Amino acid sequence: LGLVGSEMCIRDRYEEKMYAVGKIPGGFNKREGKASENAILTSRVIDRPMRPLFPKDYRNDVTLNNMVMSVDPECDPEVVAMLGSAIATCISDIPFDGPCAMTQIGMIDGEFIVNPTLAQKAVSDLKLTVASTREKVIMIEAGAKEIPEAKMIDAIYKAHEVNQEIIKFIDSIVAEVGKPKHAYESCAIPEELFAAIKEIVPPAEMEEAVFSDDKQTREENIRVITEKLEEAFADNEEWLAGL
């Protein structure tokens, strides 16, 4: 998964290697082939809680590779993959407002089960995934068989409580082997530039230009506005670079 342009690019790959079980795909789809649906969904589960914790003005590319070679067949590897990604990022020199942790909660006969096995998930009335930081819950993914709202809230609190223990464990690893976070050049656009743009091109005029239904008209409007701003900021190279 990745975003390019004005956003930071994070590539999050979760891949279960075929050669780990002695299979070398051939035929039309050679080698590993494209990512499976499960791999894509797992990558998204990893990406969602972690992406907002990177600095908003950070533009360096970040790649998280989760190559699954061996797993316990009774356990879902997506939780371990997310925790591995979080730990690797926390101990690296990459700026990251972590740690974060993720826990799955099931419910059988009214009792909560932390990180249920696949067999337990098959008969569970609840499939809940919760990611947390120290301060709050940052992601909830859930499916349930009409359980009471109070039970769902209790399950979220339970997962958040478990996540705090995991975060303490991550902190101990960072204290032992963590690297200092490296300095980086902020890509945030100065507030003064925003204010100057609003004076030259009022928000109403900007909205009318960019929300045109016709693509050619929209591109022409943007070109005209860009030329107007470049002319206004001709003496300010730093602001020109931000346009």
Can you name each region flagged by the protein language model?
Residues 2-4, 8-10:
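Short, small-residue-biased leader/transition segments that mark boundaries at the very start
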Residues 12, 42-57, 126-131:
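Structured alpha-helical segments in the cores of large, soluble enzyme domains
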Residues 25-29, 47, 57-71, 139-141:
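Glycine- and acidic-rich phosphate- and metal-coordinating loops
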Residues 49, 80-92, 155, 162-166, ...:
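Stable alpha-helical structural segments in soluble proteins, enriched in small hydrophobic residues
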Residues 53-62, 97-99, 166-184, 216, ...:
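Flexible, glycine/charged-enriched surface loops at secondary-structure junctions
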Residues 61-114:
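Gly/Ser-rich oxyanion-binding loop with an adjacent helix/lid
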Residues 93-209:
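Mobile "lid/hinge" segments at catalytic clefts and subdomain interfaces of large enzymes
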Residues 189-243:
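Noncatalytic alpha-helical scaffolds and linker/capping helices
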